[in-house]
């Protein structure tokens, strides 16, 4: 299991800044066969039907393509699998790289090699770089409220060495980071 979030950075007026990306849309892709896309939150306000106006669709594929799941041949839905691949490529930073190489990296989303060598590796590398450059909160380095004041007194490269910070940020791939 991997709990991740998305983060990005920019330079604004000569200052490097970063923030977690807040995604308000809700998407669940099941087995590359079904996609639920909507706006409802899992709370009474959204689900009781008396307050918020919410909408969602269930897209059940009826066209199938040859695919792989956990190293085995699999018939996945054309729409659901293409949506999953597109989102994964965006989050992993593969949209700008060569098409043939990137497609194969996200073909089998439940294989051990994808999880360790691609997903976890990119999330860990990005998390480490952001930690070094921005000294982000929340952080796994802060284990208790007692740790917080000391952590907040430390500065990242964005404050202490702008050139080195820019150099480090060039190694960020996509937006995927580990959730602390």
What would you call each of these model-derived segments?
Residues 1-180:
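Long, C-terminal catalytic modules of enzymes
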């Amino acid at each position: 299991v991997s709990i991740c979030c998305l983060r990005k950075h920019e330079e604004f007026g000569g200052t490097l800044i970063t923030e977690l990306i807040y995604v308000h849309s809700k998407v669940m892709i099941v087995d590359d066969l079904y996609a639920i896309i909507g706006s409802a939150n899992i709370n009474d306000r959204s689900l009781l039907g008396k307050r918020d106006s919410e909408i969602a669709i269930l897209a059940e594929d009826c066209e199938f393509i040859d695919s792989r799941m956990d190293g085995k041949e699999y018939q996945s839905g054309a729409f659901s699998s293409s949506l999953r691949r597109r989102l994964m490529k965006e989050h992993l930073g593969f949209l700008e790289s060569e098409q043939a190489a990137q497609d194969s990296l996200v073909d089998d989303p439940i294989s051990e090699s994808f999880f360790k060598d691609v997903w976890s590796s990119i999330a860990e590398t990005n998390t480490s770089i952001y930690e070094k450059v921005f000294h982000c909160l929340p952080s796994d380095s802060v284990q208790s409220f007692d740790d917080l004041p000391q952590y907040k007194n430390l500065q990242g490269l964005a404050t202490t060495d702008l050139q080195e910070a820019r150099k480090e940020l060039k190694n960020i791939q996509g937006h995927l980071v580990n959730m602390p």
